[in-house]
């Protein structure tokens, strides 16, 4: 399993999620943050979802 740290920042009516070394994505709600971060990592690294762990930090 590969560990990543994502940072989420509220920007108006949406959230911006940054995963260093991977990329940036956005989400509409707090409930979507972790799933969107994991989706970003799996898409950009071609890694299976079960092999990814994302620690989410909301700032």
For the regions a language model picked out, list residue spans one by one.
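A short, exposed loop/beta-hairpin motif centered on an aromatic-Gly-Thr core
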Residues: 19-32
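Small side chains
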Residues: 6-8, 23, 37
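Short, charged, surface-exposed hinge/linker loops at domain edges
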Residues: 1-4, 35-59
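Short stretches within intrinsically disordered, low-complexity N-terminal or propeptide regions
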Residues: 8-10, 29, 50
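Short aromatic-glycine-(Arg/Gly/Cys) micro-motifs in beta-strand/loop hairpins
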Residues: 2-19
